[in-house]
Amino acid sequence: MKFLYFFAMGLTVVANVAYHFCQKAISPNANPLVSLFFTYLSGMLITLVCIPLFYPGLQIGSAVKELNWATFALGFGIVGLELGFLLAYRAGWNLSLGALYSNVMVTVLLLPIGVLVFKETLTGRHWVGLALALSGLILLGKQ
């Protein structure tokens, strides 16, 4: 369990770096929605290759029955996220700061959602960390 805990976060970090690097590197002449289409097509193909590697013998029909509304709603969130970053980078946001601004703002919005919807608890240390993150965001925004 401990391996999965750290591996999952490491994978998230590595994939996030690759994600932002590739978003910034997409040709400025490429149509954003066509680019997203082929991004999802490559992601779908990678997923189809990985399913039998990670879950040999998986019955797709049974697995599909376990899905709920959140899987499909996530599709809308992913399109918005990816289109938003693609357009932000085209509008001139720096790779080094664009994701930081976004992630701090997302964290501020997710805190009350985590507490109210998922009954997560926040300690004083968490609130201090949030204050420091917001302070850093303000300092980064100063010219």
Which residues does each PLM region occupy?
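Hydrophobic transmembrane alpha-helices of multi-pass small-molecule transport proteins
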Residues: 125-141
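Membrane-interface interhelical linkers
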Residues: 1-16, 28-33, 38-72, 76, ...
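Residue-level hotspots within transmembrane alpha-helices of multi-pass secondary transporters
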Residues: 21, 83, 108-112
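Residue-level recognition of transmembrane alpha-helices
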Residues: 39-40, 99-103, 126, 130
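Transmembrane-helix signature of multi-pass solute transporters
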Residues: 45-49, 109-113, 135-139
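C-terminal transmembrane-helix exit sites in multi-pass transporters
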Residues: 106-125
